[in-house]
Amino acid sequence: MCAAIALLAGCASGIPLKESQPAVRERYAAYAGEPIRQFNWLGDYYSWEPVAKDELVVFTTPSEAYLLKVWPSCPDLIFVTGPIGLTSTSHTVSAGLDSVRTERMSCPIEEIRKVDYQRMQADLRREAQNKGSPGSGASPQR
């Protein structure tokens, strides 16, 4: 079997986040399902975001995301500023077999959880609408 590595040009740019890192991680974790063994991946991606020192979210499309946890022995993913890569076998990324690769390290994937990103976005839109509605404590628009 051939292991393929595809680089993910990072959206981890060092730009300050609107939310604290723990809040970002908790937001994704709240919408992540139970751990899965693997996911299909054709080597293409949309983006990625570090959410903890040993976790990142990889977007395979604009609406499909996976929360990946790597071995705790890996250095902080939060500080990775360049592209990352994922190893895969036959277009499948597997926990316990594949790794997240950066310029300086290879971090084995310990756990994969699919994020219900569409539901998360819908809930965030609903929250934003509620903040702007009368009686929600926000100032009404004039």
Where are these regions (language model features)?
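Sec-dependent signal peptide recognition
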Residues: 1-2
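Intrinsic-disorder/low-complexity peptide segments enriched for small residues
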Residues: 5-6, 95
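N-terminal secretory signal peptides
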Residues: 12-69, 128-139
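Helix-rich interaction surfaces within compact, conserved domain-sized segments
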Residues: 71-142
